[in-house]
Amino acid sequence: MVKMMLASVIRRIYSILFSSRTADKILNNIPSIVHYHCDDEFIEKFEEIIIIGDIHGCYDEFQLLLERIHQGVDNPKKILKICAGDLINKGPKSKEVLEYFMKNQDDCISVRGNHDQVMINEYINYIKTGDIAEKNSWLKELTLDGHFEFLRQLPYTIRIPKLNILIVHAGLLPDVSLENQQLVDMIEMRNIVENGDNVRVATKHNDEGVAWASVWQGPWHIYFGHDARRKLQEHPYATGLDTGVVYGNELTAKFVMGPRKGHLVSVKALQMWNDPNKKTKK
């Protein structure tokens, strides 16, 4: 009851400061569809499907990757491109990446990554206070009903039953139903540790416990990003595609349907855009 009353008071304050629609968006950045389901009718529109690792605002490398993906293809729109999250942040052209996905939603979709969430939070803070860190000043150019709403609606998972695959940014806890997975785990986890009660819990640290993907036993094959330190990961039931393009390494993608199924495509980073050894605030 107290929480409900507090939420009501907070909503009332924001409705005074902002329009009711803006207040709703600021207070609720959970997407309308948390777990997006690609039905067979949608999938049958495409001849190929490829899943792309973390782009992190590296627009030029992303375009080079698309050139390789589309090479020799009569109709690039027949290839569904799915990003494993972290479209933006850290790289030099986050707005360009964001707008590309916004303009090509018929054949380019993405799950939400932790850095997408960080920028959602930063934008909300900017709208509320007018304050923004210099490194995030590009967010000032975004629109509430356009860019922000697109980010806000990024789902946490994309599931393709026809292919028995699921895309998530960070990972899933084994033996926990999809509906009971914690939102923060799906965008931040890397490993699994056992607590004192022999219950497995998620951790974002990869120096304790074991990589969650190494113990994942299905039923879906999971494609994920987030874990650039481990680079390309290929396990029986999970494939990690974050190969650290923003850190000067590669941008990697894998075909999961069509004549090139199983093939990896990658491009080298044009330079190191972010030093992984230099600690920065989110």
Each predicted region: which residue ranges?
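Beta-strand-turn-beta hairpins that frame and shape the catalytic cleft
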Residues: 43-50, 159-166, 235
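Short amphipathic alpha-helical segments
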Residues: 63-64, 95-96, 123-124, 179-180, ...
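Active-site environment of divalent metal-dependent phosphoester hydrolases
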Residues: 56-60, 89-92, 115-120, 174-175, ...
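Acidic, His/Gly-rich catalytic cores of divalent-metal-dependent hydrolytic chemistry
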Residues: 2, 6-30, 44, 186-282
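N-terminal active-site segment of His-dependent metallophosphoesterases
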Residues: 2-98
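Active-site neighborhood of divalent metal-dependent phosphoester bond hydrolases
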Residues: 76-78, 90-200
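Residues at the starts of beta-strands that form the adenosine-phosphate
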Residues: 48, 78-80, 107, 237, ...
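Active-site neighborhood of phospho(di)ester-bond hydrolases with catalytic His/Asp-centered motifs
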Residues: 52-53, 81-85, 110-114, 168, ...
